[in-house]
Amino acid sequence: MSSDIPCCGTTFSLYVVIIIALVAFAGLMAGLTLGLMSLGLVDLEVLIKSGRPQDRINAGKIFPVVKNQHLLLCTLLIGNSMAMEALPIFLDKIVPPWLAILLSVTLILVFGEIMPQAVCTRYGLKVGAIMAPFVRVLLVLFFPISYPISKVLDWMLGKGHGVLLRRAELKTFVNFHGNEAGKGGDLTTDETSIITGALELTEKTAKDAMTPISNAFSLELDTPLNLETLNTIMSVGHSRVPVYFRNPTHIIGLILVKNLLAVDARKEVPLRKMSMRKIPRVSETMPLYDILNEFQKGHSHIAVVYKDLDEQEQSPETSENGIERRKNKKTKDELFKDSCRKPKAQFEVSEKEVFKIETGDAKSGKSENGEEQQGSGKTSLLAAPAKKRHRGCSFCILDIENTPIPDFPTNEEVVGVITMEDVIEELLQEEILDETDEYVNIHNRIRVNMHASPENLPSVITSITQSSSGSTSPNQTSHMATPDSSPTTKPSNSSPTRKPSVSSPTREPSDSSHSMAPKHEESTQTL
């Protein structure tokens, strides 16, 4: 069967041009469908805010077009379908039917699908930005047809929203961008480690970072501050030492080592006579981010970790109101018990009093006997506390002499101690070592590649120790942990009434970090 239009005429040439235009239009619609629809709204917003200059421009042109994804999809598919359906009709006019079918399939497959989709997959952002004005015209032309269909899709599938990565996916995404992954990323190992640690910190609680109470270095309330105790504190190298009363788990406060600089070891002043600070108590289920936020307020950089025995008895499986109990979680103030905070009721000032102070109405007042008092408004204004507590806050001081020993609920069992350094180590996912550390990991007893020696101690302490022969024996400091022998605690032979300066026979000093242990055996035996 011959073609309807003879070859090489004007009509024939017009049909050929139309066929080429239809193939190009179909290919453009197919390429834009893949290229534009593969660009998520979140990806475009990221490029607009933090992409390269050219990518920002391209993403800014594409975003208004891609914003209504269902409308764009319907417009591009309608245009593609019209071109593909019209192509065989024009081919049938200039070639035989069998050749029209063969040519239409070949042209659509090669130039209408494969080539444009391959190009738009690679350069989708650039091609989409160039063709954005043309797509806007198509949206207007096909609006009467595409808009109703897009609304049906919105009703059935919902409007398209940007899909955000979950936490686990985001960590994997960051790891892929590390230079160690070999995928062309430029993130260093430290950068990926810190980002991953920041993402994982939300899932970790105080129980994951604390130092067990059996490994924490602490002092008894009635410990005499003699040469032995001061040497032990010096060799441990901690800046804060918890203080307990009778039972090692009954920690009532802490003492700053810098406050002991002026102590005369010959007077053997009891520890209870020194200025001590209150120590916060945190639940073992409290997230590390909340603990870090509390530490940043300046109340304290160390806290006692307790376990609520009542919560253990009411497990989710046996509790009748397990679902409601999860909904009614404890607040941050209930998990982080800071006795150093100021009572709110003590400093509540009414709006009228504040107005009087600001307007000067409180500058003069009358006492109970009717006498005028000048400057009372100024005094009231100065008496109002500042929002930020200073370091010398009287609420943070533990007055043992004038107040009873603090007592705590019996259902709260002390299980460990946590410091700001512990939280930072979990964030960095690396151990922070200082000059006094012997072990990288106190549980696995991995030794640090540094050796503490008596030369590291101050010369004054060394000379005093050497001159006072007989006052300190090696077994007095044998409570310090050594890698080859289990630590034991023995009382001092020079004074039978002295109490050991450590709380537990198996305790290893670790106030600054759960992975930090004291100096090695040579240093403590020399002292």
From Swiss-Prot:
Low complexity composition bias: residue spans: 464-501
Phosphoserine modified-residue sites: S315
Extracellular membrane side: 1-15, 92-93, 148-527
Name of this chain's protein: DUF21 domain-containing protein At1g47330
Comp. bias intervals (Polar residues): 502-515
Residue numbers on the Cytoplasmic membrane side: 37-70, 115-126
Gene: CBSDUF7
Limits of the CBS domain: 210-271, 274-334, 366-435
Topology in the lipid bilayer: Multi-pass membrane protein
